[in-house]
Design a protein with these regions (language model features):
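Beta1-alpha1 glycine-rich phosphate/pyrophosphate-binding loop at the start
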Residues: 1-79, 163-164, 170-177
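FAD-binding core/adjacent interface of flavoenzyme oxidoreductases
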Residues: 1-3, 71-164
């Protein structure tokens, strides 16, 4: 019986772990990848999606296409039981729990932005980690530009056209342009 490798997360780490393990171990293992979406997001292109220089479809690729020899599940991870080597996921329309057994587990779920540490961020900040984030930022900027276009008051126009980028990482720098 083949060794079962279960990978949680289909971002850069999960994607490249799956690809590398398949290349290295070939048919000696059965690899399954669980991800919230059934596509891979090339995050370095999200600022271009937000800016409108490329469409959203150019920043994503179906995981099943990229990882042809690996089973892909679009699902939410609920829990991990290391004692029984079982991961519980919710998938499909009815979101019934499914239990997946593994011999080896790769946890590559990525990170989330915690905006709760600074007053006002949860209400006013936008993040840049997902395709929806890029779309939301684009819509917000367009809304602010349209607001500035119709107002006659210089202070309102200035406020509508003032944006603050927090973070000097790749996404922050690229979002600034």
């Amino acid at each position: 019986m083949k060794t079962k490798v279960l990978i949680l997360g289909g971002g850069f780490s999960g994607f490249f772990a799956a690809r590398h393990l398949k290349k290295l171990l070939k048919n000696a293992v059965s690899i399954e990848l669980v991800n919230r979406e059934n596509y891979f997001v090339f995050q370095p292109l999200l600022p271009e999606v937000a800016g409108g220089s490329i469409s959203a479809q150019n920043a994503v690729s179906p995981l099943r296409f990229l990882l042809r020899d690996i089973k892909i599940r679009k699902a939410e991870v609920d829990s991990i039981d290391a004692n029984t080597n079982t991961v519980t996921i919710f998938q499909g329309v009815q979101r019934r729990p499914t239990h997946l057994h593994y011999d080896h587990l790769v946890i590559a779920l990525g990170s989330d932005c915690d905006l709760s540490g600074t007053a006002g961020l949860e209400e006013h900040a936008l993040t840049m980690k997902t395709l929806d984030d890029a779309r939301r930022l684009r819509a917000h900027v367009i809304e602010r530009l349209e607001h500035a276009d119709i107002t006659q008051l210089p202070e309102v126009k200035e406020g509508a056209l003032t944006f603050t980028i927090i973070g000097g990482g790749f996404s922050g720098i690229e979002t600034v342009g």
